């Protein structure tokens, strides 16, 4: 990972909670990443999570069953339409969800917001998210990073997940890393195998440094 330089400014309780948006295509590993982050960070930070699905609250259920956080700290949002719209053009349903969660948990340090599965053009409204993490996966093919799109080129952190599948799909991780650097410039990225927890610590380090969290 090409990590950002640490900041001398530290986030305190006087600052609003950090809002971290997690986006990416269906099946890339967004919910798994959110689960791993919650489990790894919940003993140090006060966390709440909001998930987006079009017609169900399946991701909320999955996180609850996995024990990522207590049930009352996970809210599911049914967007009823394009998942991109609910995090960008009209984020009101998610902004309302954030307000409701912070009314319940006013001391929250981090609000995680997982978008519904979307395409490479998905981005979060700056009103909704302070940091954006975009998740793609190796199973989508070696070419994915060079396809571009705001999720790949403009997200604060790009996560390339399921590195363990590279031999099975004929993907060269070195090529993917090179293409990622060409598309993102100095913006950081992390290669992960979330099921084995590989790379999770790097994602957490990014959130803590870039999000000005006290540690």
Curated annotation (Swiss-Prot):
Chief location of this protein within or outside the cell: cytoplasm
Lineage: superkingdom: Bacteria
Gene3D superfamilies cross-referenced by the UniProt entry: P-loop containing nucleotide triphosphate hydrolases
Binding site for GTP: 24-31
UniProt GO BP: urea catabolic process
Cellular compartments per GO CC: cytoplasm
InterPro entries per the UniProt record, alphabetical: CobW/HypB/UreG_nucleotide-bd (IPR003495), P-loop_NTPase (IPR027417), UreG (IPR004400)
Subcellular compartments: Cytoplasm
Pfam families assigned to the protein according to its UniProt record, in alphabetical order: cobW
Keywords: Chaperone, Cytoplasm, GTP-binding, Nickel insertion, Nucleotide-binding
A single GO molecular function term of this UniProt record: nickel cation binding
Protein family per UniProt: Belongs to the SIMIBI class G3E GTPase family. UreG subfamily.
Subunit structure: Homodimer. UreD, UreF and UreG form a complex that acts as a GTP-hydrolysis-dependent molecular chaperone, activating the urease apoprotein by helping to assemble the nickel containing metallocenter of UreC. The UreE protein probably delivers the nickel.
PANTHER family, alphabetized: UREASE ACCESSORY PROTEIN G
Annotated function: Facilitates the functional incorporation of the urease nickel metallocenter. This process requires GTP hydrolysis, probably effectuated by UreG.
Protein name from the UniProt record: Urease accessory protein UreG
The organism's taxonomic lineage, starting at the top: Bacteria, Pseudomonadati, Pseudomonadota, Betaproteobacteria, Burkholderiales
């Amino acid at each position: 990972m090409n990590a950002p330089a640490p900041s001398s400014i530290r986030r305190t309780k006087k600052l609003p909670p950090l809002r971290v948006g997690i986006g990416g295509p269906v099946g890339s590993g967004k919910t798994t990443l959110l689960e791993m982050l919650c489990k790894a960070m919940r003993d140090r930070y006060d966390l709440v999570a909001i998930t987006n699905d079009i017609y169900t609250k399946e991701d909320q259920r999955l996180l609850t069953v996995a024990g990522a956080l207590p049930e009352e700290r996970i809210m599911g949002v049914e967007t009823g339409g394009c998942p991109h719209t609910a995090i960008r053009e009209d984020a009101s349903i998610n902004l309302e969800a954030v307000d409701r969660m912070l009314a319940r948990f006013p001391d929250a340090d981090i609000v995680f917001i997982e978008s519904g599965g979307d395409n490479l053009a998905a981005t979060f409204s700056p009103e909704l998210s302070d940091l954006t993490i975009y998740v793609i996966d190796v199973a989508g093919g070696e070419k994915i990073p060079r396809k571009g799109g705001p999720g790949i080129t403009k997200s604060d952190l790009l996560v390339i997940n399921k590195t363990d599948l590279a031999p099975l799909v004929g993907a060269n991780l070195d090529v993917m890393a090179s293409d990622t650097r060409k598309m993102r410039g100095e913006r950081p990225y992390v290669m992960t195998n979330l099921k084995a927890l590989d790379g999770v610590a790097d994602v957490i380090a990014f959130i803590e440094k870039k999000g000005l969290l006290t540690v």
